[in-house]
UniProtKB/Swiss-Prot annotation:
Protein name (Swiss-Prot/TrEMBL): Putative anti-FlhC(2)FlhD(4) factor YdiV
Organism: Escherichia coli (strain K12)
Gene: ydiV
Highest taxon in the source lineage: Bacteria
UniProt keyword terms in alphabetical order: Repressor, Transcription, Transcription regulation
SUPFAM superfamilies, sorted: EAL domain-like
Amino acid sequence: MKIFLENLYHSDCYFLPIRDNQQVLVGVELITHFSSEDGTVRIPTSRVIAQLTEEQHWQLFSEQLELLKSCQHFFIQHKLFAWLNLTPQVATLLLERDNYAGELLKYPFIELLINENYPHLNEGKDNRGLLSLSQVYPLVLGNLGAGNSTMKAVFDGLFTRVMLDKSFIQQQITHRSFEPFIRAIQAQISPCCNCIIAGGIDTAEILAQITPFDFHALQGCLWPAVPINQITTLVQR
């Protein structure tokens, strides 16, 4: 996708791996970077997303969906899930247009990722749009603990998977109270979702500290993102 702000930028997609405690690949998050045409300038993705029109939101989502479709045999063969970021604009289109929704439902390995800053997340199942989405698609909360919402949507069972925010993990792990605190969180949200993931696993030291807590999966800079042409390297040990 190409977009013009003060300059012309193009999008590049990468697969950010998600691994279990044995470092076996269980899924990926599809992330997008925006760079200038010559590749010398990168602009924050959040800044680009904030300036997209509804049509551009869907264009970007469609391009990401096409990329995942091109790799579907890889995901099916290795029994992996793939997270695709869901913006409110795309959510509206999925709810209002059956042809858009039907296309996505063809690929059950795709899960839709939202963050705590998603509009009206605090309403939980009282948010009719979010409830409707959760009844049709697997939803993932990507940054629990970022401090932008309550846990009502989690307790209402709207998410298939919940990932603890990377900054939350990295800040709390230095405290003596980390173990009882994390175990209390796990006990609270385990009945509400199928999978709890720890983000922010950026070093071997953090990995060693987090492993005893038996999270279902882990994500962080310890396992860097790869471009689409290197996706098969993610399952090589």
